[in-house]
Amino acid sequence: MEVILLEKITNLGNLGDKVNVKSGYARNFLLPQGKATAATAENVAAFEARRVELERLAAEKRSSAESRAAQLNELEITITATAGDEGKLFGSIGTADIADALTAAGLDVAKSEVRLPNGTIRQTGEYDVALHLHTDVEASIRLVVVGG
């Protein structure tokens, strides 16, 4: 199925690209989430009419993400959790806990933006946590987990 992308999608294309994708991917993911539209003649004409506005919105999202990344880079957050004698946590610290700690510090971060490639944190110590703010913008914070 041929679709027109309404935003940049990793490993697929940029705003305005006409791409061929499997029908299920288009029907179940791209179209319902507003990331693409079917490439019919009328949709192509409508997209070309809105292209400037969509590019401006994409640029605003990116600049907003870059300003957030500038605030977040080199930030250090401390989370206190109950831990045993050897530093093993009773429970774990996940993406929601990190996002809540950042929000409490006055920075707006969603849990879907926090990346923990090695899974949840189960030990006390210092960790570098990646934040995926936009398809082109990454930030990194220092997370300190202390036993309480």
Curated annotation (Swiss-Prot):
GO cellular component: a single term: ribosome
A single GO molecular function term of this UniProt record: structural constituent of ribosome
Matching SUPFAM superfamilies: L9 N-domain-like, Ribosomal protein L9 C-domain
InterPro entries to which the protein is assigned, alphabetical: Ribosomal_bL9, Ribosomal_bL9/RNase_H1_N, Ribosomal_bL9_bac/chp, Ribosomal_bL9_C, Ribosomal_bL9_C_sf, Ribosomal_bL9_N, Ribosomal_bL9_N_sf
Keyword list, A-Z: Ribonucleoprotein, Ribosomal protein, RNA-binding, rRNA-binding
Gene Ontology biological process terms in this record: translation
Superkingdom of origin organism: Bacteria
PANTHER family membership: 50S RIBOSOMAL PROTEIN L9
Family membership: Belongs to the bacterial ribosomal protein bL9 family.
UniProt function note: Binds to the 23S rRNA.
Protein name: Large ribosomal subunit protein bL9
Organism the protein comes from: Azotobacter vinelandii (strain DJ / ATCC BAA-1303)
